[in-house]
Amino acid sequence: AATRPPMHDSLPLLERTPFPAIRRATLDTLQVNLGYRCNQSCLHCHVNASPQRTEMMDDATLALIPRVLAARRPRTLDLTGGAPELHSGFRGLVRAARAQGVRVINRCNLTILLEPGQEDLAPFLADQGVDVVASMPCYSAANVDRQRGDGVFDKSIEGLRRLNALGYGQDGSGLTLNLVYNPQGPSLPPDQQRLQADYKRELAAHFGIVFNELYALTNMPIQRFGSTLVS
């Protein structure tokens, strides 16, 4: 795992703001955090997830989600964590949502596809037609391993290859593979379209990997990343 500095609380600084509350109009996407357990411990993580965290959504709460989908009819269920795939109810929830015709997004860190017991995860996602939004903070091994831990880049590349082999990111497959970039340090992301072109060129040239789109995100100034900003 990546080496972590001492934690500092950034929440009190964020609470001192006149920024108005944001209210939705209609419910289009239901995002659900299934828990804080993760097989990685990234320096930028805004929920402080790690293999040591034990907090996971309880079964009673999980059972409510298909009922909410049926009652409110959002178009998309967006599953995140931690590593959402580590929740014992993950696959059952995916099946229940897809049975209702709800689009499912799995926010995947890629290395989870190589974990013991998860060997059939990628085929499961493909069989269910789940959209994969995969964390890939750089196309450089040094930058990825600095943020996410030694060896994470190589495992991420292997995860992408497995998804590509199943049709993810391939034209006409109907299986969507989008990547997510986030800054390495206290800075804003570069232009998304230019960065996407760089990713497509470098990943194809060096690893034969294809994907659909790249999202350039700004890190949330809370938990580990917030701590680095005030350190």
Task: Name each model-derived stretch.
Residues T29, A49-M57, R72-H87, R98-G117, ...:
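Core AdoMet radical
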Residues D28-G35, L43, D58, P66-V68, ...:
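Generic ordered-secondary-structure signal
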Residues C45-V47, D58-A60, G92, E119, ...:
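Surface-exposed beta-strand edges and their flanking turn/coil or helix-capping segments
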